[in-house]
């Protein structure tokens, strides 16, 4: 589970096409990987991914074709950076709202409207 609060922002992303989908490597700070373990969950742009391996300033993930079809992870690069979040730990303040990061489908935005003159209560 995640809180939806971005903890890290990375513009250094390497992608390698694989038969199963994509190998993703994201540069992070040492602070972000402190206490991280192989198999931990990290949200990348809100998508729950499993840590394949990591170094103090680099995390590696495998992303399968289905996840690439339903998310924007295939579009990540230095021009489309990633928002990152570590999974919640029992007893930590949530500070946002509970988010699973498990993607079931995608939607198409049909229109937007300017809400500048609207009040919400």
What are these language model-derived features?
Residues 111-121:
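Single conserved hydrophobic/aromatic residue that forms the stacking wall/gate
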Residues 1-113:
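Conserved loop->alpha-helix
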């Amino acid at each position: 589970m995640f809180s939806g609060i971005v903890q890290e922002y990375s513009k250094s992303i390497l992608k390698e096409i694989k038969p199963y989908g994509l190998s993703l490597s994201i540069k992070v700070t040492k602070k972000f990987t402190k206490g991280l373990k192989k198999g931990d969950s990290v949200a990348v742009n809100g998508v729950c991914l499993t840590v394949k391996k990591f170094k103090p300033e680099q995390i590696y993930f495998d992303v399968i074709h289905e996840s690439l079809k339903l998310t924007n992870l295939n579009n990540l690069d230095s021009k489309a950076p990633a928002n990152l979040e570590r999974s919640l730990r029992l007893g930590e303040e949530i500070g946002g709202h509970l988010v699973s990061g498990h993607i079931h489908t995608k939607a198409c935005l049909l229109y937007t409207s300017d809400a500048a003159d609207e009040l919400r209560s």
